[in-house]
Curated annotation (Swiss-Prot):
It is found in: Cell inner membrane. Keywords: Cell cycle, Cell division, Cell inner membrane, Cell membrane, Membrane, Transmembrane, Transmembrane helix. Pfam families: ZipA_C. This is Cell division protein ZipA. The keyword Ribosomal protein does not apply. Belongs to the ZipA family. Interacts with FtsZ via their C-terminal domains. It is a single-pass type I membrane protein. Residues 60-182 are annotated as: Disordered. The chain crosses the membrane at residues 6-26. The keyword Membrane applies.
Length: 327
């Protein structure tokens, strides 16, 4: 315990000594800063007091004019003029005329010390604030008054511009040729293939139904079979299959008792997707059905299919697609 007390006493003494030293150091620092500022204050006071001490108590000439170089104007030049213009008169024996003349002298000397190109040749007797006689300001007023008269035409111009636009639109309405849409509708073609029995025979309905369903056809609208994008029957129709005999429809419930000389497959061009691929798929389906029912594939003129006829089908597809692309 005694050691702890000694330690605390020593620490407290050190802290007190440190505080005293810090206080002495700060007080000396403040004193040194005060001594440094005093010469500055004295010089400022001397500058303020020197003009009054250097003034001449006697009054000489009433009008004082000094010539200063005009090439390098500066603020010091103006300060010198201000120091020389006011004249303090301490002599009470001067007459009232001398006082009035001394009052007018600063204004005259300030106006005539140097020739200002902006002020022209104004003197103390000419009031510079008379702006009504200034030709420059008169022109400025006229220039400001002119846009007020020019504003109404600017407001009316949009009205004149709208009218031609409406007139142009009215002219373009009849120019839009409605017949251009008709050629696009005419640029369509129907590709037809037939599957017929050999030598005037007939195709049984039951065998035909099985082959048609296996080829991905689904019975649908107009009582005929349709080949959709998906064999399950979903998606757009790519091509269709109808009876070669009028009215061309089928009845799936009575297909077992049905027979026909052949069926017709047809597709529209342009169609969904690639027309060439759709035609290739239709040709493959026709060949498959022909093989299943024991028939043959015929062209749109009911003739035997030849390579030349296939090229003519492809040419028709290209012609329609190119025409629609140009349109």
């Amino acid at each position: 315990m005694q050691d702890l007390r000694l330690i605390l006493i020593v620490v407290g003494a050190i802290a007190i000594i440190a505080l005293l030293l810090h206080g002495l150091w700060t007080s000396r620092k403040e004193r040194s800063s005060l001594f440094r500022d005093r010469p500055v204050k004295r010089t400022k006071q001397e500058r303020v007091e020197t003009p009054i001490e250097s003034l001449d108590e006697g009054v000489g000439e009433v009008r004082v004019r000094t010539s200063h170089p005009q090439e390098k104007p500066s603020f010091n030049h103006l300060d010198d003029d201000d120091d020389e213009v006011p004249v303090i008169q301490h002599a009470e024996t001067k007459s009232a005329q001398v006082k009035t003349a001394s009052r007018q002298a600063p204004f005259a000397s300030v106006q005539t010390d140097y020739d200002d190109p902006l002020l022209g040749g104004l003197s103390a007797e000419q009031p510079p604030h008379d702006l009504s006689r200034d030709p420059l300001l008169g022109k400025a007023d006229e220039s400001y008054s002119q846009p007020q008269h020019a504003e109404p035409p600017h407001v009316e111009k949009p009205a004149h511009q709208v009218a031609p636009q409406q007139h142009v639109e009215s002219q373009q309405e009849p120019v839009a040729p409605a017949p251009e849409a008709k050629p696009q509708k005419l640029k369509e073609t129907v590709l037809v293939l037939h599957v017929a029995a050999h030598h005037g025979g007939v195709i049984g309905g039951e065998v035909l139904l099985q082959s048609v369903l296996q080829s991905g056809f689904q019975f649908g609208e107009m009582g005929i079979f349709h080949r959709h994008l998906s064999p399950a029957g979903s998606g757009p129709v790519l091509f269709s299959l109808a009876n070669m005999v009028k009215p061309g429809s089928f009845d799936p419930d009575t297909m077992s008792d049905f027979s026909t000389p052949g069926v017709s497959m047809f597709m529209m061009v342009p169609s969904y997707g690639d027309a060439n691929q759709n035609f290739k798929l239709m040709l493959q389906s026709a060949q498959r059905i022909a093989d299943d029912v024991g028939g043959v594939v015929l062209d749109d003129e009911r003739r035997m299919m030849t390579p030349q006829k296939l090229e003519s089908y492809k040419a028709r597809i290209r012609e329609v697609l190119d025409a629609n692309t140009i349109a």
